[in-house]
């Protein structure tokens, strides 16, 4: 008989390698709910509370903390223990005054990078693409699965691969960072994940091959990565703190 509906289970051995979990301790893992990020680039909120922050010893304790509304993601209370928390998301715990940004490390694992309360009010969004919608609006489709509407007159200010920095949870754009030579980028995937530096060159290829970006890191070393892996986070210097 054919399977009906999406999968609702996940074995730990098959979980994304970006998760910091014990793969052989138990058989099953929590499968993220459909939401802002893909499963590969996010982790269920319950693991943030229990395994990363250590605020609970069991899943039951972690779910109780979430149900009490003590954990905020991008400034909003999230109670769904399966909620996917991904790259550039801000996790806040008001009771303790802690704030973290989710970023990958050099081995591709998702980590919680401590940030200040002021920085927790800002979140960078990468523009994956854009499209026209009713009402003379342009819809910006962002890296975390969300979207943002801008007026038709502003459409040329927002291009694919640009980054918009928004206030959260209000989602008001405060700065636009163009994808261009000299821009400061952070690599989110690939063998050079978590490396950072300035764009030196953008090479385009025919026949549908992906664009390649050459980046110069802080030590003057050059390396290449795919354009889709390069996340602009500043012009001359990063607008957010990094590990």
Curated annotation (Swiss-Prot):
GO terms for biological process: translation. Residues 43-105 form the S4 RNA-binding domain. The gene is rps4e. SUPFAM superfamilies: Alpha-L RNA-binding motif (SSF55174). PANTHER family: 30S/40S RIBOSOMAL PROTEIN S4 (PTHR11581), SMALL RIBOSOMAL SUBUNIT PROTEIN ES4 (PTHR11581:SF0). GO terms for molecular function: RNA binding; rRNA binding; structural constituent of ribosome. Belongs to the eukaryotic ribosomal protein eS4 family. It comes from Thermococcus kodakarensis (strain ATCC BAA-918 / JCM 12380 / KOD1). The keyword Ribosomal protein applies. Part of the 30S ribosomal subunit. It comes from the Archaea. Pfam families: Ribosomal_S4e (PF00900), RS4NT (PF08071), S4 (PF01479). GO terms for cellular component: cytosolic small ribosomal subunit. Keywords: Ribonucleoprotein, Ribosomal protein, RNA-binding, rRNA-binding. CDD domains: KOW_RPS4, S4. This is Small ribosomal subunit protein eS4.
């Amino acid at each position: 008989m054919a399977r009906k509906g999406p999968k609702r289970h996940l074995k730990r051995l098959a979980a994304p390698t970006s998760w910091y979990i014990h793969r052989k301790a138990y058989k099953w893992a929590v499968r993220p709910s459909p939401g802002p990020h893909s499963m590969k680039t996010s982790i269920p909120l319950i693991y943030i509370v229990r395994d990363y922050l250590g605020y609970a010893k069991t899943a039951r304790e972690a779910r109780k903390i979430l149900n009490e509304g003590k954990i905020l993601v991008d400034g909003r209370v999230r109670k769904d223990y399966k909620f996917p928390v991904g790259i550039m998301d801000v996790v806040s715990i008001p009771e303790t005054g802690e704030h973290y940004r989710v970023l990958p490390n050099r081995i591709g694992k998702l980590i919680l990078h401590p940030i200040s309360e002021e920085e927790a009010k800002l979140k960078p969004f990468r523009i994956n693409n854009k499209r026209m919608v009713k009402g003379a609006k342009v819809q910006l489709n962002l890296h975390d699965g969300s979207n943002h509407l801008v007026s038709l007159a502003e459409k040329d200010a927002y291009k694919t691969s640009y980054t918009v920095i928004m206030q959260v949870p209000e989602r008001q754009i405060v700065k636009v960072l163009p994808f261009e030579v000299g821009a400061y980028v952070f690599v989110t995937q690939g063998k050079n994940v978590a490396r950072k530096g300035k764009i030196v060159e953008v090479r385009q290829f025919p026949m549908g091959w992906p664009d390649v970006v050459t980046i110069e890191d802080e030590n003057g070393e050059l390396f290449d990565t795919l354009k889709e892996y390069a996340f602009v986070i500043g012009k001359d210097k990063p607008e957010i703190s990094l590990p």
